[in-house]
Amino acid sequence: MTDTTMTTVHLEATGAPDVLVAAQLPLPTPGSTQVLVKTRAVGINFIETYQRAGVYSVPLPFVPGTEAAGEVVAVGSDVTHFSVGDRLATANATATYAEYFLVDQELAVQVPESISWEDAGALPLQGMTAHYLISSTFRVEPGHKVLIHAGAGGVGGIAIQLLKARGATVFTTVSSDEKAKIATAHGADHVLRYEGFAENIKDLTDGAGLDVVYDGVGKDTFEQSLTVLKTRGMAVLFGGASGQVAPFDLQKLNGLGSLYVTRPTLAHYSQDRQEISWRMGELFDAIESGDLNLTVDQTFPLAQAAEAHTYLEARKTRGKVLLLP
C-alpha cells in the first residue's frame, strides 16, 4: 500500500445532517488482532443519526459507522482468520464512514465471491437480527404461525423471507397500501393494517392464535400483540420504534394463557466469531439459494453522507441505504 491518508466523514459538533463533513485523516495501522479494510459499502443505520444529532453522546470529533464490507489490505501480527485480498463483512467495526476501516478479526466474517458488495454491506445488522429472532430466541419450525410487525421494514422484510423458507405461515402489519405491496412481495401470507390487527388475526386463526409474535414497534402494538398468542405462546419484543413499552404486571401473562415474553438484543446473540459466522453463513446461503433477496433502496457517495442521513430520517426508505466510498 502507498496511501498514508484517507478520506473520512466525521462530525466536530452535533446537530443537523450538515455537521457531517469530509476530512483527511491518517491511514490507521492495524493492531495485533485487527485487519485494515478498503471500504466497498457502508450500511447506514438510525443509531448514527441519533449520534450525529446528539441524542446519544459520542466523543468529538467522531467518525460514525459500524456496519461495512470491503477488501482486506493489511493484517495485524496475530491475525489468523484473514489474509490480504480477502472479502470481509462486519456489523461490529468502528469509524466505517471512511475509505478504510479497522476491525478485530473476531468480529468479522469472510464474504463469498457470489455475494455483491452492496448485499455484503446491507446484510449484517438487519440480517443477523432477523436470524437470531427466528433461529434462537424462538426457533421457528415448519407449520408455525408467526406475526412479525413492520413487514415492509428492513428486519421485517428479511424475516418474512426466511420464515417462508422454513415453512411458516407469516402474518405481518404495515401502515399503507404501498408498504402492503412490499410485504406481499416478500412473501407474507397475511398482510394487515396496524388498526385492528389483533381482531383480524383472531378471525384468520379461528381464535386459535399464533405461536410467536416478533414486535419491533413496541408501545403502539405490544399489548395487542399479547392477545393474538395461543396458550404458551411467546412475545419477542426486540425494539421500540413507536416508543418503549410501559411496565406491566406479570400476572397478565397468566391470564392470557401462560405466555412467555422476552426482550433480546443482537449483542447477546452475536457474542463470538463462531456465532457470528454461523448466522452470516446461513444468511449468505439464503441469498445464494434465492430464498433471500435484499433491497438496497439508495446509495450515496461517501462525501454525500449528510444527504444520506437526510434521506434516512425522512422515513420513506424502502430498503437499505448505503454509502459507497
Q: Predicted segment positions?
A:
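A glycine-/small-residue-rich N-terminal strand-loop-strand element
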Residues: A69-A93
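C-terminal hydrophobic helical "lid"/dimerization subdomain
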Residues: T2-T4, R273-P325
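NAD(P)H dinucleotide-binding glycine-rich loop of Rossmann-like/cofactor-binding domains
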Residues: A89-A150
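Adenosine-nucleotide cofactor-binding segment
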Residues: I148, K164-Q224, D272-I276
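N-terminal glycine-rich beta->alpha transition that marks the start or flank
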Residues: D3-T4, T14-V19, Q24-A69
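Hydrophobic/small residue at the entry helix of a nucleotide-binding pocket
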Residues: V155
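Glycine-rich phosphate-binding loop and adjacent beta-alpha segment
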Residues: V174, D220-D291, P325
